[in-house]
Amino acid sequence: MVAVSIMVVGAEIALTNLGDLFGWGNIQLGWFAFPFTLIAVIGAINALNMVDGVDGLAGSLSLIALISMGLLAWQGGRALEAWTALLFSVSIIPYLLCNLSVCGRKRRIFLGDGGSMVLGFVIAWLAIALSQPEVGTA
């Protein structure tokens, strides 16, 4: 989690604007943006880690989230984020094929802490990068 903190603060990608959640206008986080972002990223990582115990659930959820974000990024002209989502999506497919016994074997595998944490971090990172205005455009 220390590495996540360093990457979030070092990259300066933060949840600065939560949008119009309650109909009162945009909610700007100001100085609370980096702590809120850190809590949100760690929460997303732990959420994906918790669902890894069910066969194929973490991989399926990750695949759906990454394909959706990739398509939306591509449509919005964000090619780097779209390709990142596509590459991670393609890497999840063989894992799912083996995990759901499509390969013909009865073996079950889990992502483990390393896999679920990386996927949770990538999904959270893409969600933040795609939901916040780019620097200099807002």
Regions found by a protein language model. Give the residues of each.
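"…together with the soluble PPM/PP2C metallo-phosphatase catalytic core" -> "…together
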Residues: 1-138
